[in-house]
Amino acid sequence: MNPSTAVARRLVNALVEAGVEHVVYCPGSRDAPIGYALADAETAGWLRVYVRLDERSAGFVALGLGRAGCPAALVTTSGTAVANIHPAVLEADAAGVPLIVLSADRPAEMWHTGANQTTVQTGIFGSAPRLSTDVPAGFPADERLDALVLRAVTAATGALSADPGPVHLNVSFRDSLVPDGPWQPQALVPRRVSSFPTAPTPLVMPARTVVVAGDGAGSLARELAQQGGWPLLAEPTSGSRVGDNALTDYQTVLGSELVDDVEAVLVLGHPTLSRPVSRLLARPDVTVVTDRSRWTDVAGVARVVTGPVELAEIDTDPAWLGRWKDADRPVVPTAKQRLCRDIWWACTTPNAPVLVIGASEVIRCFDRFAVPGDIAPTALANRGLAGIDGTIATAIGVGLGTGRPVRVVVGDLTFAHDAMSLLLGETEPEPDVQVVVLDDRGGAIFSGLEHAAAPAPVLRRMFLTPQRLDSAALAHALGASHRRVSPDDLQFLDEPVVGRQVVSVPLT
């Protein structure tokens, strides 16, 4: 067996033993040894492989798998292929999503020589990876490689650090890159690292506390709000926008005199959507407690930064929550806001699709108008760095990981940016993903920012950037179905999501 084949097979074996069940593979020559090994491992039933042409899109598919609770490996060939996954790596870092990058490389003697498709890939992702290392050509295909892979997967999942995120193994291969024969994988010996239990930090909170639940906060935010009798300001992707304590239009309430009476803020997850919340968290007279494992005190005023929390002592004010609920009064929505509200409600029904929400103006419509009920949708978004790129690819990854249909709601620019992620190879499994495009002809978010004061031609060209895009023709070219509906035509929300669908909703 040639050395490259031996390392590739041992690498795949070690990934599976460490618990990796999903791999996104981008075809190339230098990563071919891993490709052959993956094909044999998939035939043996060890894992699932998803082949994608575009590395940028592939990175976000892998990110979506990680968001779905299925840490995935992402395999690329050398050169610019590696650079193209950088956006997904940065999002995984900021959002704390496991992502295991395996980049194939030329051997070190070919670096800095002008060799084809060769650049310095070591450290290409800067400080983003939780672990980054080279596997040089000739590295032994033995227990040392197993241990390295286990370290990488453990770092990615945050099993020991409580800080999941991307890792990078740069694997160099010398010729020959083709195996001598097929691989027949043998029985596996699972190798896992158990996480260290972390005792919750007991907190003593004053009566006039509010709970802010940002992206990924989970159900703990709701539980703490209920225990304390506190208002819950929960973003749509917090996982806690549900129950009697949660407010709908908390941004408007934060503009009232109530905010002057706030004594403390308990922050869970990663809040990014609301300037009123940011102003509240920046107040020096308010005690801010955040549970993030990474430092996220943007304003620099947090009194406590901790891990898991529990309430040790609670001062209660029976009227406190009622005052906030009374101030949370309905606002007349626009057609776009009304549609976001209705989509949210439709995704709370049994067997509803997973909801993936695009960045920019769309998620802010959900944030102001998604009414908390008894059940919250499974709602996800890329809020680590809040870019519009890769949203559709992320949704596809979420669907592959959960095995559930996905409804992804985006603006027209977000759709244009990532529509190519709907392209699917003839041999690849068909995802059930419905892309709802709220088409208001450009970047509507800028109309609500200070840039709205720019001269109309400047605003239109430099910020709104409307596109001439035939979404129906593009969808059909990529193999997806397409339909155009009015904002009041909600029938599509009652129909099953099967295959790749694009639903365009003109708003202008």
Curated annotation (Swiss-Prot):
EC number, as in UniProt: 2.2.1.9
Pfam families hit by this protein: TPP_enzyme_C, TPP_enzyme_N
Cofactors, names only: Mg(2+); Mn(2+); thiamine diphosphate
UniProt xrefs under HAMAP family: MenD
Cofactor annotation comment: Binds 1 thiamine pyrophosphate per subunit.
Entries under CDD domains matching the protein: TPP_PYR_MenD (cd07037), TPP_SHCHC_synthase (cd02009)
The name this protein goes by in its record: 2-succinyl-5-enolpyruvyl-6-hydroxy-3-cyclohexene-1-carboxylate synthase
NCBIfam families: menD
Coiled-coil segments: none
Reactions it catalyzes: isochorismate + 2-oxoglutarate + H(+) = 5-enolpyruvoyl-6-hydroxy-2-succinyl-cyclohex-3-ene-1-carboxylate + CO2
Keyword Manganese: yes
Family: Belongs to the TPP enzyme family. MenD subfamily.
Keyword terms, alphabetized: Magnesium, Manganese, Menaquinone biosynthesis, Metal-binding, Thiamine pyrophosphate, Transferase
Domain of life from the UniProt record: Bacteria
Gene that encodes the chain: menD
Top-level class of the enzyme under EC nomenclature: transferase
Function noted in UniProt: Catalyzes the thiamine diphosphate-dependent decarboxylation of 2-oxoglutarate and the subsequent addition of the resulting succinic semialdehyde-thiamine pyrophosphate anion to isochorismate to yield 2-succinyl-5-enolpyruvyl-6-hydroxy-3-cyclohexene-1-carboxylate (SEPHCHC).
Molecular function GO terms recorded: 2-succinyl-5-enolpyruvyl-6-hydroxy-3-cyclohexene-1-carboxylic-acid synthase activity; magnesium ion binding; manganese ion binding; thiamine pyrophosphate binding
GO BP: menaquinone biosynthetic process
Pathway: Quinol/quinone metabolism; 1,4-dihydroxy-2-naphthoate biosynthesis; 1,4-dihydroxy-2-naphthoate from chorismate: step 2/7; Quinol/quinone metabolism; menaquinone biosynthesis
